[in-house]
Amino acid sequence: PTLRVLHLEDNDADHALVVAHLRRGGIQADVHRVDNEADLTDALYDDWDLILSDYNLPGYSGLAALDKIRSMGKLVPFILVSGEIGEDIAVQAMRNGANDYLLKSNLARLAPAALLAIEANRTRIAKQQADLALSHSRQQLRELAQHLQASIEQERAAIAREIHDDVGGGLTAVKFDLSWILRHSP
């Protein structure tokens, strides 16, 4: 299957290099490039399998792009790709939800990192769906338990009324019998 990849990159040569490394790594990809915040915002209305982002963009940064993507509720795998990225920025990117970061000088890691990020995202989504299904099942179980408890209480009340009526009726008959005996005894 062909992956849909959004690439935030302002340099044509770097974009071509990323596309070449994806293909060299065996990834069939339809790669769409944007280089500014407005185009990114428009592109985020589509569904993507992977987002790759340069760190330094004109008037914009890869971290700002990541924040925008996450604030829109998009949980697409995100890899920061940059010519120069310090450890602090890499750590901040990972804390903000990036799946990985790569230096442009080490693009041989791009295809494996992309596949790993996509698989991790699929696993995360499957876990979320399973957690949601489990939560739904637990809620149904709670509702059934409450219904069962209410049914038990209703049945107990009905049995108690029936016993009360039977015993009450029996006692009334005994009272009548005793009254009759007392009236007719010497």
Where are the predicted features?
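Hydrophobic pocket-lining residues within nucleotide cofactor-binding pockets
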Residues: 37, 57, 185
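Coiled-coil dimerization/phosphotransfer module
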Residues: 128-186
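Generic detector of well-ordered alpha-helical packing
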Residues: 10-11, 15, 55, 101, ...
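Helix N-cap/capping motif at the beta->alpha junctions
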Residues: 33-42, 62
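N-terminal membrane insertion elements
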Residues: 2-3, 11-27, 43-131
